[in-house]
Amino acid sequence: QQLSDAKIRIAAKTNCSKFIAYFQSYTNTYAPVAYLCSIYEEALQSPEIVALSIGTRSDCLGEDVLLLLSELQEKYPHKQIWIELGLQTMHNDTLQKMNTHTTVEQFDSAIDALTRIHIPVIAHVILGFPNETKEMMLQTISHVSRLPVSGIKLQLLHVLKNTELGNRYLEKPFPVMELMPYCDLVIDCLELLPPDLVVHRLTGDGPRNLLLAPLWSTDKKRVLNTIHHRLKERDTWQGRLFIS
């Protein structure tokens, strides 16, 4: 039903007739394999669906899930199956402070496993963790640039209500990224990435009713326009500083 509703909503805004089924929220491989198979196949069997994008964690890709993904890829050769894998940062101390309970080593291992079964991976990276410097964030981007991933999503850190990070912010506000430094950081990231790597996202807009900071991020069009403007001003491009 969610899929049908989404197709109707999108078709009303555009002339699209083909869609990507995006299992985004939470961890979409954390369930019994039989159940995962049923919901994935329900999407793949729809003639309008051309790809399946599954968001998950590096510690939720057991052998049974990998086998399922491999089997579905063989069963539906004309449709694409992607995994969106959360790295967030390569710095384990940050991951520990953010309570992700994952490590960069787990992420790299998951990349290896997915590469072996020819499943494309989109790496998800968060920019703006409170304890991270610009150099640390660019180290994460350089790390991703050396991995066999097919795409990347760059996500600005959002501080949201009713979260541990949000509670910390309300008790003792910490610095969050401002618009111009963020846009320039995104461009620095693009320069380090392979020129042929697909960039699926340059920012994000958190739910307005929950967002504590940074409030400028709600104007996504302004953020994207600023990035494009700064690219021209700096006369630079994706891959300019990439070293293979």
In which residue ranges do the predicted regions lie?
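Auxiliary Fe-S-binding modules of radical SAM enzymes
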Residues: 151, 159-244
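Structural recognition of alpha->loop->beta junctions
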Residues: 40-49, 139-153, 224-238
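Hydrophobic faces of well-ordered beta-strands that scaffold small-molecule active sites
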Residues: 19-21, 50-54, 81-85, 121-125, ...
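Residues that line or immediately flank small-molecule/substrate-binding pockets and catalytic motifs
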Residues: 56, 156, 206
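A structural motif corresponding to the C-terminal end of an alpha-helix
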Residues: 46-49, 110-121, 147, 185-197
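Active-site phosphate/pyrophosphate- and oxyanion-stabilizing loops and adjacent acidic/basic residues
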Residues: 41, 67, 187
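Conserved non-cysteine loop/helix-boundary elements of the Radical SAM core domain that shape
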Residues: 25-38, 51-117, 127-147, 165-180
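Conserved alpha-helical substructure of the radical SAM core
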Residues: 1-21, 34, 38, 45, ...
